[in-house]
Amino acid sequence: MNLPIRVMIAGIGGASLGTEIRKSLTLAGGYEIYGCDVSKTAYGLYEDDFAETWCVSRDDYVTNVLNVCIESGTGFLIPGGEQPMTLLGAASDTFAAAGIQLLANTPEVIARYSDKDETFRRLAARGIPIPQTAVINTQSDLDQIGLPCIVKPATGSGGSVGVFFAVSPDEAMIYADFIRRTGSVPIAQQYVSDREGEFTIGVLSLPTGQIIGSIALRRVLDAKLSVAYRGRGGLISSGYSQGYIDEFPDLCQQAEQIALAVNSRGPINIQGRVRDGVLLPFEINPRFSASTYLRAMAGFNEVDLLIKYLLHREMPQRPEIQSGWYLRSLTEQFVAKEIVK
């Protein structure tokens, strides 16, 4: 009888990447899943599907996560969000020294492609089609972008946090000033219509750079959960992806070319809209996506595929995709005050 594979997920808040990763591992079977979070009210801390969970302090975060990994005997650690990815990715050697494999892209890819200004400059330099993108310092910077446009922070805008739709130069500068006052660098990006569809595409690469496969979801944008803003001829999607999963070979091939261009060595998620059949990425995240469980339901369980490769060093076969609609909602649970961690 094979022993279960022990995995730690760092970052398990409600409706988060971490809880979606947990569901993907549960679906695959054969895992003993542990979790940790910095918030004592994180949804996942009280989910029964975790073998054990910990509330860890933000202070000396990496050491605290390392300690609970050692305590639980986990061999794999998966960041469950953008901040854990950045912090833990930079310390991947620390975990490797303790015999713990971090399921993430390389520290170099994470550092380069977590900043949108650098991301889109690098993509343009590699000949990848992109929406016009520029840092906003003065109103004249908008000339190369055009209107309407999207204004957002260069870092930390996952789930469409701090993303604005601007129809005039004055409005764009107000949003840019707001972003700057929060300590971030504002960028403007050409607005691309969703007429030909908005897609989220996951590309999974091995540590060698070889691509296992990719999977695309065409987002449904008529549901309230999926829309952060709609009005004045523009639409901004939310962080809750749902929609239709199919092969979409042309778009997946374009996404795989992006993964190769950025030298991806693990999971990467590409969000974009299509114009004249060309995928125009507006967001690239070098990590698993919060739609990873939808992908697992469709047959492409990227978390399980990567772990199995790291264990056995055998190239997995590309799974067959079950085409169809993949929809989601929010769930609730009661936690008695006596058991809050």
Regions found by a protein language model. Name each.
Residues M8-I9, F76-P79, P131-Q132, I187-Q190, ...:
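Short catalytic-loop micro-motif centered on adjacent basic/acidic residues
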Residues G44-L45, V62-V65, A111-D115, G159-G162, ...:
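Short, charged, surface-exposed secondary-structure boundary motifs
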Residues E82-Q83, P107-A111:
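Short histidine/acidic/glycine/proline-rich micro-motifs that form metal-
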Residues M1-L103:
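ATP-binding N-terminal substructure of ATP-dependent carboxylate-amine bond-forming enzymes
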Residues M85-T86, G158-G159, S289, Y293:
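Short glycine-rich, flexible loops that bind phosphorylated cofactors or substrates
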Residues I5, A10, S72, Y244-K341:
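ATP-dependent carboxylate activation and anion-phosphoryl transfer catalytic cores
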Residues D170, F178, Q190-N263, N285-L311:
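ATP-dependent carboxylate/phosphate-activation module, predominantly the ATP-grasp catalytic core
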Residues I110-R195, S205-Q210:
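Active-site nucleotide/adenylate-binding loops and adjacent lid/helix of ATP-dependent enzymes
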